Amino acid sequence: MTSDINALKYKKVLLKVSGEALMGDKQFGHEYDVIKKIAGDIKEVIDLGVEVTIVVGGGNIYRGINAALVGMDRASADYIGMLATVINALTLQNVMESLNIYTRVLSAIPMMSVCEPYIRRKAKRHMEKKRVVIFAGGTGNPFCTTDSAAVLRAIEMNCDILLKATQVDGVYDSDPKKNPNAKKYFTISYKDVITNNLQVMDMAAIAVAQENKLPIRIFSIKDQGNFAKVIQDKGKYTTIEE
């Protein structure tokens, strides 16, 4: 696929991929056919001429907040969750490189034997060389979600927009899986997301995005080719902005 990059509204984007998206219909781990599809969708966007960076979650392997609820120390549980994001980042890297996408994994928790440490200037240099940077390890701090990491990295990398790939095709006023009459928003303000406590993203992440005027677009990763459509203002999605 070819495109005039100057015609695209968003030329540099950060894609947030949840750990759950990588496990497909499984209850745990990875579904490689699903990961290959996601990698193919990413390649389609790269072929448009868009610079893509990625933040991955770790919920398909470990959720720190859930472990804390059953008595585990929250900080320790969150660190284990950060390790899960590194596993996911390395998995996604390998699948993407099988499609000839040049990729680097940078972790907020240094693991010199398996990936590079996160250094902002190094990440930007990789992007200048047309490599896809996958950010792992969350923010490197406990009590912070990978949603917060995605917002921070998008701002640090001067991305035009953050796209969150989820299991639903946008933001609803209630859970569409439980309420068939749930209302979907095409656009919604940061303030309304926070005021109505819409559980589409961590509220701290929404607040930082609002302060830095970073638009967020929520879409479904299940639909083949939807990433490229959403980049071009097509397909199904919800945009969160002022």
Curated annotation (Swiss-Prot):
ATP binds at residues 16-19, 59, 63, 166-167, 172, 175. InterPro entries: AceGlu_kinase-like_sf, Asp/Glu/Uridylate_kinase, Uridylate_kinase, Uridylate_kinase_bac. Keywords: ATP-binding, Cytoplasm, Kinase, Nucleotide-binding, Pyrimidine biosynthesis, Transferase. Its main location: cytoplasm. It is found in: Cytoplasm. GO terms for molecular function: ATP binding; UMP kinase activity. Its EC number is 2.7.4.22. It comes from the Bacteria. CDD domains: AAK_UMPK-PyrH-Ec. Pathway: Pyrimidine metabolism; CTP biosynthesis via de novo pathway; UDP from UMP (UMPK route): step 1/1. Inhibited by UTP. UMP binds at residues 58, 78, 139-146. GO terms for biological process: 'de novo' CTP biosynthetic process; UDP biosynthetic process. GO terms for cellular component: cytoplasm. Belongs to the UMP kinase family. Catalyzes the reversible phosphorylation of UMP to UDP. This is Uridylate kinase. It comes from Rickettsia canadensis (strain McKiel).
